[in-house]
């Protein structure tokens, strides 16, 4: 599973899995104000973001890789596929080689594309 700035809605408290979930790659901006990076919960209802889900996976022993995209907002939902090396690494290790790892990493893109570049199919000089 590839999750870019995603979350799970639950009306029964924190998410529970009847079966072991597939290995999951989470990528989420820590400044996301659209979908919670962590969680929003009111009584038994809640929206559980990547940080909360990764913590749940860790406690339950499920395989996952969680990239916190430092300083990024919900744009990660649009730019997740701009990280082919991380995605290829995850698919190779977790899916094809069946590694059962749990990984948390912080990714701070020092050469981040300007926001307007995300709306173009590919950010190249030809598209400017």
Each predicted region: which residue ranges?
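Loop/turn elements at helix/coil->beta-strand transitions in domains of secreted/extracellular proteins
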Residues: 1, 20-24, 60-65
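Extracytoplasmic/secreted cell-surface and envelope-processing proteins
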Residues: 9-13, 34-36, 75-79
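Conserved alpha/beta-hydrolase "acid-adjacent" motif
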Residues: 33-49, 79
């Amino acid at each position: 599973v590839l999750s870019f700035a995603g979350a799970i809605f639950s009306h029964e408290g924190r998410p529970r899995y009847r079966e072991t979930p597939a290995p999951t790659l989470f990528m989420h901006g820590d400044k996301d104000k659209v979908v919670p990076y962590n969680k929003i919960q009111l009584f038994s209802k809640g929206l559980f973001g990547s940080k909360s889900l990764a913590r749940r996976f860790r406690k339950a022993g499920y395989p996952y890789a969680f990239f916190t995209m430092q300083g990024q907002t919900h744009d990660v939902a649009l730019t997740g596929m701009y990280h082919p090396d991380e995605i290829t690494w995850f698919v190779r290790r977790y899916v094809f080689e069946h590694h059962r790892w749990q990984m948390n990493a912080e990714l701070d893109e020092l050469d981040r594309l300007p926001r307007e570049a995300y709306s173009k199919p590919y950010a190249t000089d030809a598209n400017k």
